[in-house]
Regions:
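Alpha/beta-hydrolase-fold enzymes
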Residues: 207-265
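Conserved hydrolase catalytic core segment
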Residues: 117, 121-126, 155-220
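C-terminal subdomain of alpha/beta-hydrolase-fold enzymes, centered on the catalytic histidine
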Residues: 244-405
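Conserved HGGG/HGGXW glycine-rich cap/lid loop of the alpha/beta-hydrolase fold
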Residues: 91-143, 390
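Glycine-rich "HGGG/HGxG" loop immediately N-terminal to the catalytic nucleophile
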Residues: 57-59, 124, 136-152, 170
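Beta-sheet entry/capping signal
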Residues: 79-81, 96-99, 128-132, 155-159, ...
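Non-catalytic accessory segments flanking enzyme active sites
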Residues: 13-87, 294, 303-306, 310-325
Length: 405
């Protein structure tokens, strides 16, 4: 294991500016159209101008280096991770190890506002967190896997994640229930596609369209109904998923060679998948939750490491027959689980499906704002949810131990 520092690369910055200055933009957008057709071209030109004239890569590198970076070998791969230990004032507190797992099109940048909220002690709380946040294989500074592997963890820890962090964390909880002490997620869902659970859910949801409260609680009805609106939104916003699952190297190659194309493709998701209403806004609502610096930090992590192609391959690997044969989607999660539910998750599973999947569900909390990238969008809310979940995890483990003795 060794420490990694992002380094300042003047030649690289000059090359990037040359590419940005010679961007070939398409024709102007349709009149009266904002983000309905994808990233708005007029706003993309403003992004390019900010990137060229206001975004200071060297200053951002200093910011990225404000958290300690390391690399280590895991299953033969060079894996990059942040390892943030508690503040010095926490010396008499119990240290809780937690693994934060990012998703796509995010990166470790998603956690920069969250991590300080976890490693800083809270008044009248007898524990604090030690955080490990890896770059997934093929993302950022982590080496891509030629053949997917499942390394056996040797320690015990808690896991938190949304987006791909949910799916990977869920699978870890199923595969290694003795190592994963508790699973916290901002995107709990049951994606078991076997005929019986799918048919049962379909019937419940269909009846719920006629009888309010049948399939979902009244306060959650807007998540599914009207069904036509929900279905249309899913079709509109999941095209990238099918493309990356079937032709990852094609889209990866296209994005690898165009910084402005990469920015548009990544930032589009931070617009539409944080709130569907953002499609109607000329700036895609991007600066409602994020700064342009934060969004460009994320783009730069992909651009400087040439990792977009290997990152999108994750979709193909997880939808492959080899992965499906592992039957993680069908297996129950038995470790203590806490679900933080946000209104604009990409895929909504009714609570009865969530309870079916997670057999030791200690908490479901519901919030009024936020989408697929909750830790990046709402770090304070996610931090509070994690802090609140730990005592419930400990209690569930203690009750399980008492019951088995």
């Amino acid at each position: 294991m060794y420490k990694l520092n992002y380094t300042k690369e003047n030649d690289f910055s000059k090359h990037l500016k040359f590419r940005l200055n010679h961007t070939k933009f398409p024709h102007a957008p349709l009149k009266g159209v904002s983000f309905e057709y994808g990233f708005n071209i007029d706003y993309l030109k403003k992004i390019r101008s900010y990137w060229l004239n206001n975004y200071d890569w060297n200053a951002r590198l200093t910011f990225l280096n404000s958290l300690p970076h390391f690399k280590t070998i895991v299953s033969g791969l060079d894996i990059h991770f942040i390892h943030a230990k508690p503040a010095a004032s926490a010396k008499n507190l119990k240290v809780i190890p937690i693994l934060l797992i990012h998703g796509w099109p995010g990166s470790i940048r998603e956690f920069y506002e969250l991590i300080p909220l976890l490693i800083t002690p809270r008044k009248n709380v007898d524990y604090v967190f030690e955080v490990v946040a890896p770059s997934l294989p093929g993302f950022g500074y982590s080496e891509a896997a030629a053949i997917p592997d499942w390394p056996l963890p040797k320690s015990k820890f808690y896991v938190s994640g949304g987006n791909w962090g949910f799916k990977i964390g869920r699978d870890m909880a199923i595969a290694y229930p003795e190592n994963v002490l508790g699973f916290h997620s901002t995107m709990c869902m049951d994606v078991h596609l076997a005929p019986v659970p799918v048919a049962w859910t379909a019937v419940n949801v269909w009846i719920g369209s006629f009888i309010p409260g049948f399939a979902v609680a009244k306060e959650d009805e807007y998540r599914l109904y009207p069904l036509r609106d929900y279905t249309n939104w899913l079709w509109t916003e999941t095209g990238y998923l099918h493309l990356q699952a079937t032709k990852p190297d094609t889209i990866g190659t296209a994005l690898l060679d165009s910084p402005i194309g990469l920015a548009a493709y990544l930032m589009d998701k931070f617009s539409s998948l944080t709130n569907p209403a953002n499609r109607k806004l000329p700036d895609g609502g991007l600066t409602k939750k994020f700064t342009l610096d934060a969004l460009l930090d994320n783009v730069m992590i992909y651009w400087t490491t040439d990792s977009i192609l290997t990152a999108v391959r994750l979709y193909s690997e997880y939808l492959s027959n080899d992965y499906i044969k592992l039957k993680f989607d069908a297996a129950p999660v038995k470790v203590p689980t806490a679900c933080a539910r946000f209104p604009y998750e990409l895929v909504y599973s009714p609570d009865f499906r969530v309870n079916r999947k997670f057999k030791n569900l200690v908490r479901i909390s519901k919030y009024n704002d936020g989408g697929l990238y909750a830790a990046f969008e709402e770090p304070k809310i996610v931090a509070n949810d994690i802090w609140t979940s730990i005592p419930l995890f400990l209690e569930a483990r203690q009750n399980a131990s008492s019951g088995s003795s």
